[in-house]
């Protein structure tokens, strides 16, 4: 009972923070390096599908997992959306989201920067790519990425991959 309550409280805390944890990594697929969205060749089709769904100039708050991409976006005429895209570039869900008025525009997100950050975290933390739980956009100050590790710990970097540092 206590464990269940702790899990619910922990999960709820992040969901309230970002609104992007509503959907789990929906693919259920193995997070192998060659299929990981932390690789630019795999992330770019997912970003392209997202651009097509919401437009490249829309502001987005992103969460990138090994096999899925989730975005809160504020889209004129459609309102605030939560869009989920698989690693194959398929839009699998679009529902009401939390909005992203203070987030960067989608065109500012670089698949190459995500791969650069992932490679640097793997090297500096001495982990495997599969040990990265997810990337989450931090829009509280200047746009940046927070990189959460499965075993605990958080790394932070600029949206372009600069200034990588251990955060927690």
Where are these regions (language model features)?
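Extracytosolic low-complexity repeat regions of secreted or lipid-anchored proteins
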Residues: 104-158
């Amino acid at each position: 009972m206590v464990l269940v309550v702790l899990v619910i409280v922990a999960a709820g805390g992040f969901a309230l923070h970002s609104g992007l944890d509503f959907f789990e990594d929906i693919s259920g697929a193995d997070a192998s390096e060659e299929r990981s969205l932390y690789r630019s060749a795999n992330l770019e089709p997912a970003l392209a599908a997202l651009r097509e769904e919401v437009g490249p100039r829309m502001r987005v708050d992103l969460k990138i997992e090994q096999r899925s991409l989730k975005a809160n976006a504020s889209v004129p005429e459609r309102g605030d959306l939560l869009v989920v895209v698989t690693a194959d570039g398929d839009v699998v869900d679009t529902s009401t989201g939390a909005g992203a008025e203070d987030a960067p525009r989608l065109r500012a997100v670089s698949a190459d920067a995500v791969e650069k950050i992932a490679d640097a975290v793997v090297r500096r933390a001495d982990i495997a790519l599969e040990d990265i739980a997810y990337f989450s956009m931090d829009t509280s100050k200047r746009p940046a990425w927070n990189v959460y590790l499965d075993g605990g710990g958080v790394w932070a970097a600029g949206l372009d991959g600069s200034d990588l540092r251990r955060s927690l």
